[in-house]
A protein has these predicted regions:
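...with weaker cross-activation on analogous glycine-rich loops/strands in unrelated enzymes
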Residues: 6, 75-153
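Alpha-helix initiation/capping motif
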Residues: 38-39, 61, 88, 93, ...
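Aromatic- and glycine-rich peptidoglycan recognition patches
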Residues: 4, 123-193
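Generic low-complexity segments that are intrinsically disordered, proline-rich and/or Lys/Arg-biased
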Residues: 26, 33-36, 81, 93, ...
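N-terminal capping segments
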Residues: 1-75, 191-193
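Extended, compositionally biased low-complexity polar/Lys-Gly-rich tracts
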Residues: 41-48, 95-115, 163-190
Length: 193
């Protein structure tokens, strides 16, 4: 498996969940643009994030990103042992995950498609995460969980109620500052592929 294959897999998996909106804060979702409820998709999302270990009610941006990597790894037929290595390093907490990857010299300053973007809100322990889908100049396109379509405050920008596309500055914006990027190449090193 190459880093490009993994990147494509991560983006493909994350794209499946775009448009889900919270119907219960940080715990249940539905796509308002599809008929009926999206129970099968929501159950899959919850299952992928629970492995992180994420619990309903918790902020889920990093658990969403971790779950999308998990789904991509499974689709590329990695071993359970390799998946355990990924899960031992990535957590549902952005700042902790950044520290884990930095300690291993695997947190990059450069974004590439398929990377997980990790940011910190000011000097707090609160953070935000997203999956990079494209990079252009000083900006990146992302797919993010737990974000807002129209952020009216820093808090709503990092903890909204959608899984959707966003455009962000690579360095962050407002008090949301980029900590670094977990690239597909870093993920492959973690799992020993």
């Amino acid at each position: 498996m190459t880093s490009d294959q993994l990147a494509q897999g991560i983006i493909r998996q994350a794209s499946r969940f775009i448009g889900l909106r919270e119907v219960k804060p940080n715990a249940d979702w539905d796509n308002p643009n599809t008929p009926g409820n999206d129970r099968a998709l929501v159950d899959e999302l919850r299952s992928l994030m629970r492995q992180s270990p994420w619990e309903p009610g918790w902020a889920y941006c990093a658990a969403f990103a971790e779950g999308m990597v998990l789904a991509a790894l499974r689709s590329l037929a990695v071993t359970p042992e390799q998946i355990k290595r990924w899960q031992a390093t990535m957590t549902p907490h952005c700042v902790t995950s950044a520290a884990n990857f930095r300690t291993l010299s695997l947190l990059s300053e450069n974004a590439v498609p398929g990377s997980i973007w990790l940011a910190r809100h000011g000097s707090t322990s609160n953070g935000h995460a997203g999956i990079v889908t494209a990079v252009r100049g000083v900006s990146m396109a992302t797919i993010e969980g737990n974000t807002s379509l129209d952020p009216s405050s820093d808090a709503k920008e990092r903890e909204g109620d959608w899984i959707t596309h966003r455009i962000r500055f690579l360095k962050g914006s407002g008090t949301l500052n980029t900590l670094g990027f977990i690239t597909p190449a870093s993920i492959l090193k973690i799992i020993g592929a």
